[in-house]
UniProtKB/Swiss-Prot annotation:
The active site is at residues 106, 168, 197. One of its GO terms (cellular component) is cytoplasm. This is Deoxyribose-phosphate aldolase. It catalyses: 2-deoxy-D-ribose 5-phosphate = D-glyceraldehyde 3-phosphate + acetaldehyde. Belongs to the DeoC/FbaB aldolase family. DeoC type 1 subfamily. The keyword Lyase applies. SUPFAM superfamilies: Aldolase. CDD domains: DeoC. Its EC number is 4.1.2.4. Its main location: cytoplasm. GO terms for molecular function: deoxyribose-phosphate aldolase activity. It comes from Rhizobium meliloti (strain 1021) (Ensifer meliloti). Keywords: Cytoplasm, Lyase, Schiff base.
């Protein structure tokens, strides 16, 4: 669809603060509590993570805990985690989240419609939500574990054509980790037309560096793992993660 050469080139290396500025952390599992959201906000602000996401009912609380105008954005999920909600329901949820202070939204794509080949429905849904919440950016989650390679290509193309800011690999609700092989399918499809967020099973600096070389510009990482990775980056020679070569 798009020439891969149009992708933004990654930096040669990252300092710990630069790494944190590429990572979203979240408390979006069903069991997460108010205390978890408060802890999330504290960690996100202290460490300089680019975004903190909470389930919709906790977004107003999260917004109140994260200083406006700081390094950390507040986000929330739409149609989460199945993606099977109606377009009207998803749109209403997205608008409410934006009104409650969410600065970016991660929406689950309608996997069933993708697998049914109903691409027009999916395209129209994404466009409707993008328009309803503008200028708040929308990331669209594919949940790669549920899609074939051809479905990944088709879904990625739809996202790139629909005005979303990012295509995202997964919700973190499935056990499958994001792989370089699956990411390549997305990159080959979207080129530089849309940014890519990798989420799910990312646990090493080597994985981050490899994904950045492919074109990934944002990561969704378990909170404690994210903190540990920033610490590991600081402990590398020169205190920087080498993206051009290998980590450490």
């Amino acid at each position: 669809m798009n020439n891969i050469s149009n992708r933004r080139q990654p930096p040669a290396s990252l300092a710990p603060r630069d790494l944190a500025a590429l990572i979203d952390i979240s408390a979006v599992q069903a069991f997460h509590t108010e205390a978890d959201v408060r802890e999330l906000a504290g960690i996100a602000v202290a460490e300089g993570f680019i975004a903190a996401h909470a389930l919709p009912n906790f977004v107003p609380l999260l917004r109140s805990l994260v200083p406006s105008g700081g390094l950390t954005l507040v986000g929330g999920p739409v149609g989460f985690p199945s993606g099977g909600h109606s377009t009207r329901t998803k749109t209403a949820e997205a608008v409410e989240l934006a009104e409650n202070g969410a600065q970016e939204l991660d929406m689950m794509i309608n996997v069933g419609r993708i697998k049914s080949g109903d691409f027009g429905y999916v395209r129209s849904e994404i466009r409707a939500i993008v328009e309803a919440i503008a200028p708040v950016p929308l990331k669209v989650i594919l949940e790669l574990a549920h899609l074939t390679d051809e479905e990944i290509r088709a879904a990625s193309a739809i996202v790139a054509e629909s005005g979303a800011a990012f295509v995202k690999t997964g919700t973190g609700w499935t056990p499958s980790a994001t792989t370089l092989e699956k990411l390549k399918l997305i990159v080959e499809t979207v080129g530089g037309a849309v940014e890519i967020k990798a989420s799910g099973g990312i646990r090493s600096l080597d994985a981050i560096a490899g994904m950045m070389r492919l074109g990934v510009t944002r990561f969704g990482i378990n909170t404690q793992v994210a903190v540990d990775l920033v610490r590991q980056c600081a402990a590398l020679p020169g205190g920087r993660l080498d993206i051009a070569g290998k980590a450490g």
